[in-house]
Amino acid sequence: MIGNHLRSYTINHALPVILKSDDVPVICHANEGMGPLVMSFTQFGVETDMMLAFGLAGASICTENSAIEKELWSSLAERQGWTNVAQDARLAQQLLNRDAGIRQVRAFQHTVDYFKKQYNYDFGEGTCPKIKLEVEELLLLVGATSALQALQNDVASGRLINVDMAIPPKIVHAMACLDNTKWWGFPKSVQAALTVVIPESPEAEAQGWKDLQSATEFGEKVGMRLSHATYAVVASIKGRDDHLRDALKRFEAVPKEKINPDYLLLDQLADIVMRHFADRYWMRSEGHRAPTENYSKFWDEKEQPSAELNGMLDNM
Protein backbone atom coordinates (compact mmCIF):
# COMPACT_ATOMS: atom_id res chain seq x y z
CA MET A 1 0.00 0.00 0.00
CA ILE A 2 1.46 3.35 -1.09
CA GLY A 3 0.37 5.06 2.14
CA ASN A 4 2.37 2.68 4.33
CA HIS A 5 5.39 3.03 2.04
CA LEU A 6 5.11 6.82 2.23
CA ARG A 7 4.93 6.69 6.02
CA SER A 8 7.95 4.39 6.26
CA TYR A 9 9.98 6.51 3.85
CA THR A 10 9.05 9.77 5.59
CA ILE A 11 9.95 8.58 9.09
CA ASN A 12 13.03 6.50 8.27
CA HIS A 13 14.59 8.51 5.46
CA ALA A 14 13.06 11.96 4.96
CA LEU A 15 12.80 13.04 8.61
CA PRO A 16 16.53 12.70 9.42
CA VAL A 17 17.35 14.84 6.37
CA ILE A 18 14.69 17.40 7.29
CA LEU A 19 16.07 17.72 10.83
CA LYS A 20 19.49 18.61 9.38
CA SER A 21 18.04 21.43 7.27
CA ASP A 22 18.38 25.09 8.19
CA ASP A 23 15.77 26.28 5.66
CA VAL A 24 12.71 26.71 7.84
CA PRO A 25 10.40 28.31 5.23
CA VAL A 26 10.97 25.43 2.79
CA ILE A 27 10.12 22.87 5.49
CA CYS A 28 7.12 24.91 6.57
CA HIS A 29 5.61 25.25 3.10
CA ALA A 30 6.40 21.63 2.24
CA ASN A 31 4.34 20.57 5.24
CA GLU A 32 1.47 22.79 4.10
CA GLY A 33 1.52 21.15 0.68
CA MET A 34 1.86 17.55 1.84
CA GLY A 35 -0.74 17.74 4.62
CA PRO A 36 -3.84 16.92 2.55
CA LEU A 37 -2.08 13.98 0.88
CA VAL A 38 -1.14 12.48 4.25
CA MET A 39 -4.68 13.01 5.56
CA SER A 40 -6.09 11.09 2.61
CA PHE A 41 -4.31 7.90 3.69
CA THR A 42 -6.14 7.81 7.04
CA GLN A 43 -9.28 6.38 5.42
CA PHE A 44 -7.28 3.34 4.28
CA GLY A 45 -6.11 2.42 7.77
CA VAL A 46 -2.62 3.92 7.46
CA GLU A 47 -1.15 5.25 10.73
CA THR A 48 -0.95 8.97 9.99
CA ASP A 49 -1.01 10.57 13.45
CA MET A 50 2.78 10.81 13.68
CA MET A 51 3.21 12.37 10.24
CA LEU A 52 0.31 14.77 10.77
CA ALA A 53 1.63 15.85 14.17
CA PHE A 54 5.05 16.67 12.72
CA GLY A 55 3.49 18.19 9.60
CA LEU A 56 1.02 20.47 11.35
CA ALA A 57 3.67 21.61 13.83
CA GLY A 58 5.91 22.52 10.91
CA ALA A 59 3.12 24.15 8.90
CA SER A 60 2.24 26.44 11.81
CA ILE A 61 5.64 28.12 11.69
CA CYS A 62 5.04 30.27 8.61
CA THR A 63 1.64 31.37 9.90
CA GLU A 64 3.14 32.31 13.26
CA ASN A 65 5.94 34.25 11.54
CA SER A 66 3.34 36.24 9.59
CA ALA A 67 1.53 37.01 12.84
CA ILE A 68 4.73 38.38 14.36
CA GLU A 69 5.25 40.65 11.34
CA LYS A 70 1.74 42.06 11.76
CA GLU A 71 2.42 42.59 15.46
CA LEU A 72 5.58 44.57 14.70
CA TRP A 73 3.78 46.66 12.09
CA SER A 74 1.00 47.36 14.57
CA SER A 75 3.46 48.47 17.25
CA LEU A 76 5.33 50.70 14.79
CA ALA A 77 2.12 52.25 13.45
CA GLU A 78 0.93 52.95 16.98
CA ARG A 79 4.19 54.75 17.79
CA GLN A 80 3.73 56.87 14.65
CA GLY A 81 0.17 57.74 15.61
CA TRP A 82 -1.39 55.82 12.72
CA THR A 83 -4.30 54.52 14.74
CA ASN A 84 -6.27 52.87 11.94
CA VAL A 85 -3.20 51.15 10.51
CA ALA A 86 -2.21 49.92 13.97
CA GLN A 87 -5.69 48.55 14.66
CA ASP A 88 -5.92 46.84 11.27
CA ALA A 89 -2.51 45.20 11.67
CA ARG A 90 -3.42 44.01 15.16
CA LEU A 91 -6.66 42.43 13.92
CA ALA A 92 -4.77 40.67 11.12
CA GLN A 93 -2.23 39.49 13.69
CA GLN A 94 -4.93 38.01 15.91
CA LEU A 95 -6.43 36.06 13.01
CA LEU A 96 -3.00 34.68 12.09
CA ASN A 97 -2.36 33.78 15.74
CA ARG A 98 -5.65 31.91 15.67
CA ASP A 99 -4.74 30.00 12.51
CA ALA A 100 -1.28 29.08 13.82
CA GLY A 101 -2.73 28.01 17.14
CA ILE A 102 -5.36 25.81 15.52
CA ARG A 103 -2.66 23.94 13.63
CA GLN A 104 -0.66 23.53 16.83
CA VAL A 105 -3.68 22.22 18.75
CA ARG A 106 -4.24 19.68 15.99
CA ALA A 107 -0.57 18.67 16.08
CA PHE A 108 -0.92 18.09 19.82
CA GLN A 109 -4.13 16.11 19.37
CA HIS A 110 -2.50 13.83 16.79
CA THR A 111 0.31 13.28 19.30
CA VAL A 112 -2.23 12.39 21.99
CA ASP A 113 -4.02 10.05 19.59
CA TYR A 114 -0.78 8.35 18.56
CA PHE A 115 0.26 7.48 22.10
CA LYS A 116 -3.25 6.37 23.00
CA LYS A 117 -3.43 4.02 20.01
CA GLN A 118 0.13 2.69 20.18
CA TYR A 119 0.68 2.53 23.96
CA ASN A 120 -2.78 3.03 25.49
CA TYR A 121 -1.21 6.06 27.18
CA ASP A 122 -3.33 9.02 28.19
CA PHE A 123 -0.97 11.90 27.49
CA GLY A 124 0.42 13.42 30.67
CA GLU A 125 -1.44 11.04 32.98
CA GLY A 126 -0.47 7.90 34.85
CA THR A 127 2.69 5.88 34.24
CA CYS A 128 4.93 6.80 31.33
CA PRO A 129 4.90 4.36 28.41
CA LYS A 130 8.03 2.37 27.58
CA ILE A 131 8.72 4.19 24.34
CA LYS A 132 10.40 1.94 21.79
CA LEU A 133 11.59 4.35 19.10
CA GLU A 134 13.60 7.56 19.25
CA VAL A 135 11.28 9.17 16.72
CA GLU A 136 8.41 8.57 19.17
CA GLU A 137 10.34 10.46 21.85
CA LEU A 138 10.80 13.29 19.36
CA LEU A 139 7.07 13.18 18.65
CA LEU A 140 6.29 13.53 22.34
CA LEU A 141 8.63 16.53 22.55
CA VAL A 142 7.22 18.19 19.42
CA GLY A 143 3.61 17.53 20.41
CA ALA A 144 4.12 18.98 23.88
CA THR A 145 5.86 22.04 22.46
CA SER A 146 3.03 22.54 19.96
CA ALA A 147 0.52 22.60 22.82
CA LEU A 148 2.46 25.31 24.64
CA GLN A 149 2.81 27.33 21.43
CA ALA A 150 -0.93 26.98 20.86
CA LEU A 151 -1.58 28.41 24.30
CA GLN A 152 0.63 31.43 23.53
CA ASN A 153 -1.12 31.99 20.21
CA ASP A 154 -4.50 31.63 21.88
CA VAL A 155 -3.66 34.41 24.33
CA ALA A 156 -2.23 36.60 21.53
CA SER A 157 -5.39 36.08 19.46
CA GLY A 158 -7.66 37.23 22.27
CA ARG A 159 -8.67 33.65 23.13
CA LEU A 160 -10.14 32.90 19.70
CA ILE A 161 -9.14 29.23 20.09
CA ASN A 162 -9.97 28.68 23.75
CA VAL A 163 -7.20 26.17 24.42
CA ASP A 164 -7.98 23.84 27.32
CA MET A 165 -6.09 25.13 30.37
CA ALA A 166 -5.88 21.58 31.72
CA ILE A 167 -3.20 20.85 29.09
CA PRO A 168 -0.15 22.60 30.66
CA PRO A 169 -0.02 20.34 33.77
CA LYS A 170 -0.21 17.33 31.44
CA ILE A 171 2.77 18.68 29.51
CA VAL A 172 4.79 18.85 32.73
CA HIS A 173 4.01 15.22 33.51
CA ALA A 174 4.73 14.09 29.94
CA MET A 175 8.17 15.72 30.01
CA ALA A 176 9.10 13.31 32.80
CA CYS A 177 8.80 10.52 30.22
CA LEU A 178 11.84 11.85 28.35
CA ASP A 179 15.51 11.51 29.24
CA ASN A 180 16.52 15.08 30.10
CA THR A 181 20.18 14.49 29.23
CA LYS A 182 19.42 12.86 25.89
CA TRP A 183 17.10 15.69 24.88
CA TRP A 184 19.49 18.53 25.69
CA GLY A 185 17.93 19.67 28.98
CA PHE A 186 14.74 20.75 27.23
CA PRO A 187 12.29 18.62 29.27
CA LYS A 188 13.52 20.18 32.52
CA SER A 189 13.28 23.65 31.00
CA VAL A 190 9.59 23.08 30.22
CA GLN A 191 8.93 21.86 33.75
CA ALA A 192 10.81 24.85 35.18
CA ALA A 193 8.86 27.19 32.91
CA LEU A 194 5.51 26.18 34.33
CA THR A 195 6.93 26.38 37.85
CA VAL A 196 7.78 30.04 37.19
CA VAL A 197 4.56 30.90 35.35
CA ILE A 198 2.33 29.27 37.99
CA PRO A 199 4.52 29.29 41.13
CA GLU A 200 3.48 27.61 44.36
CA SER A 201 5.64 30.03 46.36
CA PRO A 202 8.25 32.78 45.84
CA GLU A 203 10.95 30.23 46.67
CA ALA A 204 9.64 27.83 44.01
CA GLU A 205 9.63 30.61 41.43
CA ALA A 206 13.20 31.61 42.29
CA GLN A 207 14.30 28.00 41.92
CA GLY A 208 12.45 27.80 38.61
CA TRP A 209 14.48 30.71 37.22
CA LYS A 210 17.69 28.98 38.31
CA ASP A 211 16.55 25.75 36.65
CA LEU A 212 15.84 27.60 33.42
CA GLN A 213 19.32 29.07 33.42
CA SER A 214 20.84 25.67 34.20
CA ALA A 215 18.93 24.18 31.27
CA THR A 216 20.40 26.78 28.90
CA GLU A 217 23.89 26.03 30.20
CA PHE A 218 23.42 22.32 29.59
CA GLY A 219 22.05 23.04 26.12
CA GLU A 220 25.11 25.12 25.31
CA LYS A 221 27.38 22.21 26.20
CA VAL A 222 25.61 19.81 23.83
CA GLY A 223 24.98 22.28 21.03
CA MET A 224 21.21 22.75 21.33
CA ARG A 225 19.54 26.03 22.25
CA LEU A 226 15.90 25.02 22.66
CA SER A 227 15.99 25.76 26.38
CA HIS A 228 17.04 29.33 25.62
CA ALA A 229 13.76 29.81 23.79
CA THR A 230 11.84 28.43 26.77
CA TYR A 231 13.72 30.84 29.05
CA ALA A 232 12.83 33.78 26.78
CA VAL A 233 9.16 32.78 26.56
CA VAL A 234 8.85 32.68 30.34
CA ALA A 235 10.70 35.97 30.76
CA SER A 236 8.28 37.61 28.32
CA ILE A 237 5.19 36.13 30.02
CA LYS A 238 6.39 37.33 33.44
CA GLY A 239 7.45 40.75 32.15
CA ARG A 240 11.02 40.22 33.33
CA ASP A 241 13.20 42.21 30.94
CA ASP A 242 16.29 41.33 32.97
CA HIS A 243 15.78 37.64 32.28
CA LEU A 244 14.81 38.30 28.66
CA ARG A 245 18.06 40.16 28.07
CA ASP A 246 19.95 37.35 29.78
CA ALA A 247 18.27 34.76 27.55
CA LEU A 248 19.09 36.71 24.39
CA LYS A 249 22.71 37.16 25.44
CA ARG A 250 23.11 33.49 26.29
CA PHE A 251 21.62 32.48 22.95
CA GLU A 252 23.81 34.74 20.82
CA ALA A 253 26.93 33.78 22.76
CA VAL A 254 26.84 30.17 21.49
CA PRO A 255 29.12 29.81 18.42
CA LYS A 256 27.36 28.52 15.31
CA GLU A 257 29.93 25.75 14.89
CA LYS A 258 28.86 24.25 18.23
CA ILE A 259 25.28 23.59 17.08
CA ASN A 260 24.33 19.92 16.72
CA PRO A 261 24.18 19.37 12.91
CA ASP A 262 21.77 16.43 13.24
CA TYR A 263 19.07 18.69 14.72
CA LEU A 264 19.90 21.96 13.00
CA LEU A 265 16.24 22.56 12.12
CA LEU A 266 15.20 22.60 15.78
CA ASP A 267 17.95 25.08 16.60
CA GLN A 268 16.82 27.26 13.68
CA LEU A 269 13.30 27.22 15.08
CA ALA A 270 14.69 28.38 18.42
CA ASP A 271 16.61 31.08 16.55
CA ILE A 272 13.37 32.34 14.99
CA VAL A 273 11.71 32.48 18.41
CA MET A 274 14.62 34.44 19.86
CA ARG A 275 14.61 36.83 16.92
CA HIS A 276 10.89 37.45 17.51
CA PHE A 277 11.49 38.33 21.16
CA ALA A 278 14.45 40.54 20.26
CA ASP A 279 12.38 42.37 17.63
CA ARG A 280 9.53 42.95 20.07
CA TYR A 281 11.90 44.21 22.77
CA TRP A 282 13.75 46.58 20.45
CA MET A 283 10.50 47.84 18.92
CA ARG A 284 9.07 48.57 22.35
CA SER A 285 12.16 50.46 23.49
CA GLU A 286 13.69 51.92 20.32
CA GLY A 287 10.88 52.02 17.78
CA HIS A 288 12.40 49.55 15.32
CA ARG A 289 13.12 45.84 15.15
CA ALA A 290 16.37 44.36 16.44
CA PRO A 291 19.63 44.75 14.48
CA THR A 292 20.47 42.03 11.97
CA GLU A 293 23.38 40.95 14.16
CA ASN A 294 24.36 41.38 17.81
CA TYR A 295 20.77 42.05 18.88
CA SER A 296 21.74 41.22 22.47
CA LYS A 297 24.10 44.19 22.56
CA PHE A 298 21.50 46.61 23.82
CA TRP A 299 21.17 50.33 23.20
CA ASP A 300 21.88 51.28 26.82
CA GLU A 301 25.14 49.34 27.09
CA LYS A 302 28.20 51.53 26.71
CA GLU A 303 31.20 50.30 24.80
CA GLN A 304 33.99 49.56 27.26
CA PRO A 305 37.53 50.42 26.09
CA SER A 306 39.83 47.41 25.88
CA ALA A 307 42.62 46.83 28.37
CA GLU A 308 45.13 47.18 25.52
CA LEU A 309 43.76 50.60 24.61
CA ASN A 310 43.83 51.71 28.23
CA GLY A 311 47.48 50.67 28.42
CA MET A 312 48.36 52.65 25.31
CA LEU A 313 46.64 55.74 26.71
CA ASP A 314 48.47 55.37 30.02
CA ASN A 315 51.82 55.29 28.22
CA MET A 316 51.19 58.44 26.22
For every predicted segment, state its role.
Residues N180, W184-F218, A235:
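Alpha-helical adaptor scaffolds
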Residues M1-W184, D241-M316:
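N-terminal alpha-helical interaction modules that lie
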Residues I198-E205, K238, S285, R289-T292:
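Generic local-structure boundary detector
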Residues F186-V190, M224-T230, N260-L266:
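Alpha-solenoid helical repeat scaffolds
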Residues D49-L56, K188, A192-T195, H228-Y231, ...:
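TPR repeat positional signature
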Residues W209-R250:
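Glycine/small-residue-rich hydrophobic helix-like segments
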Residues S60-E64, L151, T195-P199, A235-S236:
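Generic structural signal for hydrophobic core residues of well-folded globular domains
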